[in-house]
C-alpha cells in the first residue's frame, strides 16, 4: 500500500511541474471579473511602494527556486509522521495521507501563483496592494494584519527551534556556558544572524543560506529513509534497545474507536502549515529578474514539487519506522547513540 502511495506522490509532483507550462495558471480570470473602479485602482497603484511600474528584479530562476523551496521547507516537515500517528497506526493510513499531501500541495502552489499573477495584472509589488486592487481596499488592512501576525509567529518558531538546537550543540561541544542557555542562544542568533538576513534588500544573496538549509533537509530525508530501509529500529535492530518503549515502533495496535475520526485534521493542519509561504509570493514576483508569468510559474512549481517530495519521503519513512509512536519531532524517536541522528 505504501509503495502505491509513494508512486502517487511522485506522479502528482510530475503533474504539478507540468502546470508551469499552463499559461492560464493564477487568478487573472477571477480578477478580471471583479475589477475596481478606475480612479480607485489608480489610487491603489499610487500607494504601492513600487509605483505603477515595478523595478527590475535581481534574482534569476534558479536562485528563486532555492529561496522559495527553503521558505516552504522548515522544521515542520519533521512533525508530519506524527500527523499520521494522530489518527492511525496502520500502514494503510499512508494512502489517505498521500492524497491529502498531493491535494494540498497543488492548491497551495496554485494559490501562490495566483498572488504573483495578481501583482502582474495590477503592476503592484505587495500582497496587500494586490488584494486591495483585486478585492477591495476595505479589507486590505485585515490582510496586512494577518500576514504580520503569521510571519511574526513563523520567526518566533524559527528562533525557538534554533535556540533549542544550538544550545544543545553548545553543551555537547564545550562552548561557553552563556551559550548553554536556550534564551541566550535565541537572543544571540536572532540579533546576529536572523535579523541581518531579514534586512537584506537583495534576496539573491540568500541563495547560499538557502542551499545550506536545503542540504540539511535533504540530509534528514536521506537519513530517515536509510534507517527505515536498514531496519536499525525494528525489534532486534541495532538501536531498538536504546530507545524508550514509548518511542519504539508500534503498528496495528489501535482498535476501532480508539481515535476520533476528526483526528485526521491534525495532519491536515500540519500539511497546510507546511506549504504556507504565501506571504512571500509578491516578493518573489518583484525580485525575479526579467520577470514573466512563465518564469514565475516555473519557480513556483519546481519549488513546491521538490518540497512535496521531501515531505512525502520524511512522512513515509518516519511513519513506517515508528508507526503510532512517531513523535511530534521525529528526530526525538532516534537513539542518542545513533551518530547519523545526532548529525541530523
Task: Locate predicted features.
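Transmembrane alpha-helical segments of multi-pass small-molecule transport proteins
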Residues: 8, 67, 71, 101, ...
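Extracellular loop-to-transmembrane helix junctions
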Residues: 81-124
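Membrane-interface "cap" regions at the ends of multi-pass membrane proteins
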Residues: 16, 21-82, 87, 109
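Residue-level signature of the transmembrane alpha-helical core
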Residues: 69, 98, 102, 145-148, ...
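Central hydrophobic cores of alpha-helical transmembrane segments in multi-pass inner-membrane proteins
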Residues: 75, 105-114, 190-199
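Cleavable N-terminal signal peptides of Sec/SRP-targeted secreted and luminal proteins
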Residues: 4-18
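Membrane-water interface regions at transmembrane-helix termini and the short interhelical loops
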Residues: 83-87, 191-212, 287
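Membrane-interfacial loop- and helix-cap regions that link adjacent transmembrane helices
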Residues: 56-57, 62, 113, 119-144, ...
Amino acid at each position: 500500500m505504501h509503495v502505491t502511495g509513494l508512486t502517487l506522490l511522485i506522479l502528482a509532483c510530475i503533474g504539478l511541474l507540468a502546470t508551469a507550462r499552463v499559461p492560464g495558471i493564477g487568478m487573472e480570470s477571477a480578477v478580471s471579473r471583479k475589477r475596481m473602479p478606475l480612479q480607485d485602482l489608480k489610487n491603489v497603484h499610487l500607494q504601492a511602494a513600487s509605483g505603477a511600474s515595478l523595478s527590475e528584479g535581481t534574482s534569476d530562476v534558479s536562485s528563486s527556486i532555492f529561496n522559495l523551496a527553503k521558505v516552504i521547507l522548515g522544521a515542520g516537515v519533521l512533525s508530519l509522521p506524527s500527523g499520521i500517528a494522530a489518527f492511525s497506526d496502520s500502514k494503510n493510513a499512508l494512502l489517505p495521507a498521500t492524497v491529502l499531501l498531493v491535494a494540498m500541495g497543488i492548491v497551495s502552489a496554485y494559490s501562490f501563483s495566483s498572488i504573483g499573477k495578481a501583482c502582474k495584472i495590477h503592476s503592484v509589488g505587495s500582497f496587500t496592494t494586490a488584494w486591495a486592487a483585486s478585492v477591495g481596499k476595505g479589507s486590505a488592512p485585515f490582510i496586512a494584519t494577518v500576514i504580520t501576525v503569521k510571519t511574526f509567529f513563523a520567526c518566533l518558531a524559527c528562533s525557538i527551534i534554533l535556540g533549542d538546537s544550538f544550545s544543545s550543540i553548545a553543551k555537547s561541544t564545550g562552548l561557553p556556558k552563556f551559550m548553554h542557555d536556550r534564551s541566550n542562544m535565541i537572543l544571540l542568533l536572532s540579533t546576529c544572524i536572523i535579523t541581518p538576513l531579514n534586512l537584506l534588500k537583495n534576496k539573491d544573496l540568500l541563495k547560499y543560506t538557502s542551499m545550506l538549509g536545503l542540504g540539511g533537509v535533504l540530509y534528514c530525508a536521506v537519513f530517515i529513509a536509510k534507517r527505515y530501509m536498514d531496519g536499525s529500529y525494528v525489534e532486534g535492530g541495532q538501536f531498538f534497545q536504546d530507545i524508550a518503549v514509548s518511542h519504539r515502533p508500534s503498528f496495528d495496535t489501535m482498535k476501532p474507536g480508539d481515535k476520533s475520526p476528526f483526528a485526521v485534521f491534525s495532519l491536515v493542519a500540519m500539511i497546510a502549515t507546511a506549504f504556507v509561504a504565501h506571504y512571500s509570493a509578491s516578493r518573489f514576483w518583484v525580485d525575479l529578474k526579467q520577470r514573466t508569468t512563465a518564469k514565475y510559474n516555473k519557480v513556483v512549481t519546481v519549488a513546491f514539487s521538490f518540497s512535496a517530495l521531501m515531505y512525502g519521503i520524511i512522512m513515509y519513512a518516519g511513519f513506517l519506522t515508528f508507526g503510532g509512536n512517531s513523535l511530534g519531532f521525529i528526530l526525538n524517536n532516534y537513539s542518542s547513540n545513533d551518530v547519523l541522528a545526532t548529525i541530523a
